[in-house]
């Protein structure tokens, strides 16, 4: 969540305040301004920030290892599964988990490119 908060704060701070003030003159509440004006205008950067935050979070290996440890079936994420299976000698499962990580990363990059190309 911290990964996404920095990007989201930057997105909304760069939002032109004239739109916000115009919505206030039309008697929209701040919540309705957010829902009806700001989010529709900033949906692409918000989706990109969320996808990037999710891709960073899925690759968090060091923090998981330091805080939760490497416990099979309890704190096992995909990067942790690669680590645990390589250390136990199950290379086929480690390669499978690595291929899943590559597939997920490729899908995320494809989604980002499709969003950036859409006008």
Swiss-Prot record:
The chain crosses the membrane at residues 51-73, 91-111. InterPro entries: MetI-like, MetI-like_sf. One of its GO terms (biological process) is transmembrane transport. The keyword Cell membrane applies. Disulfide bonds: none annotated. Its main location: membrane. It comes from the Bacteria. GO terms for cellular component: plasma membrane. It is a multi-pass membrane protein. Keywords: Cell membrane, Membrane, Transmembrane, Transmembrane helix, Transport. Residues 1-112 form the ABC transmembrane type-1 domain. It is found in: Cell membrane. Belongs to the binding-protein-dependent transport system permease family. CysTW subfamily. This is Putative uncharacterized protein HI_1475. It comes from Haemophilus influenzae (strain ATCC 51907 / DSM 11121 / KW20 / Rd).
């Amino acid at each position: 969540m911290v990964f996404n908060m920095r990007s989201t704060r930057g997105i909304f701070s760069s939002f032109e305040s004239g739109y916000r003030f115009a919505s206030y003159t039309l008697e929209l509440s701040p919540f309705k301004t957010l829902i009806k004006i700001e989010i529709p205008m900033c949906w692409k950067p918000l989706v990109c920030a969320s996808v990037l935050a999710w891709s960073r979070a899925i690759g968090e290996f060091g923090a998981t290892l330091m805080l939760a440890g490497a416990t099979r079936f309890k704190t096992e994420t995909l990067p942790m599964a690669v680590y645990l299976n390589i250390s136990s000698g199950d290379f086929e499962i480690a390669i499978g988990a690595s291929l899943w990580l590559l597939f997920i990363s490729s899908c995320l990059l494809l989604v980002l490119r499709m969003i950036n190309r859409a006008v």
